[in-house]
Amino acid sequence: RTKRDVCELPFEEGPCFAAIRVYAYNAETGNCEQLTYGGCEGNGNRFATLEDCDNACARY
């Protein structure tokens, strides 16, 4: 997958319940948003920091 592909994926919180704060790119708004990740599964549209999300997706 390319970075563009990852950034176009919808955020998936996954089935677990760890409640980890992460950032994901919202292709509809064109912004990275803070969301809650369950800690397992999900997809590549998940970043530890806002900066990582912006660097990967914000202006692709």
Curated annotation (Swiss-Prot):
Tissue/organ expression: Expressed by the venom duct.
Annotated GO CC locations: extracellular space
Pfam family, one: Kunitz_BPTI
Domain remark text: The cysteine framework is IX (C-C-C-C-C-C).
Disulfide bond positions: C7-C57, C16-C40, C32-C53
Organism name: Californiconus californicus (California cone)
Propiece span(s): 1-2
Ranges annotated as spanning the membrane: none
Annotated localization: Secreted
Site (described: Reactive bond for chymotrypsin): F17, A18
Major site of localization recorded for this protein: secreted
SUPFAM superfamilies linked: BPTI-like
Cited PANTHER family: BPTI_KUNITZ INHIBITOR DOMAIN-CONTAINING PROTEIN (PTHR10083:SF374), KUNITZ-TYPE PROTEASE INHIBITOR-RELATED (PTHR10083)
Domain named BPTI/Kunitz inhibitor: residues: 7-57
One function term, GO molecular function aspect: serine-type endopeptidase inhibitor activity
UniProt entry keywords in alphabetical sequence: Disulfide bond, Protease inhibitor, Secreted, Serine protease inhibitor, Toxin
Protein name according to UniProt: Kunitz-type serine protease inhibitor conotoxin Cal9.1c
Family that this chain belongs to: Belongs to the venom Kunitz-type family.
